[in-house]
Amino acid sequence: MRLVTANVDRFDRVVVSNTGLPMYGKEPSAAFRAWQKFSQEVPVFEVGKLCNGGSQTDLGADVVAAYDAPFPDETFKAGARIFPALYPDGENDPSNIANKKAWEILHSFTKPFLCAFTDGDPVTAGGDRAFVGKVPGTAGQPHTTIVGGGHFVQEDKGEELAGVINDFMAATPK
């Protein structure tokens, strides 16, 4: 989301799925806190296995291996490992400051903005409520909940998500 708000002129429309832009003062779910703790404490961060666990379907050994491929050893996983720890846990937390600035821009973002969250992600299910009605571009859009998808919607319901995106693009030409 911060990429969008830092480059508004480069986007004609936005589709968000299984994401968020949290601010300090709103406690995350217990599932997120468990994920955050796990990410910092597990000795071996098995990216492919984690992606498989975040999906509703079994990804298969070849897909798990593809998710592991960019990370030949633990030293390559620092970014993936630290990402959950970037949750803004204080008013002056750098993530909180950056997210506040991003929300200021989103509150006046009038370009078409569609939410397509899944129902099967324990962390982000229902996350569309953070955007719909708060981002002006969400008005009148056909927001959808993709049933049966986990966090990695592209794996569980990739064709359905692609259809939602294609329909949205066709309905909102630039």
Regions found by a protein language model. Give the residues of each.
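Serine-hydrolase catalytic core
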Residues: 102-109
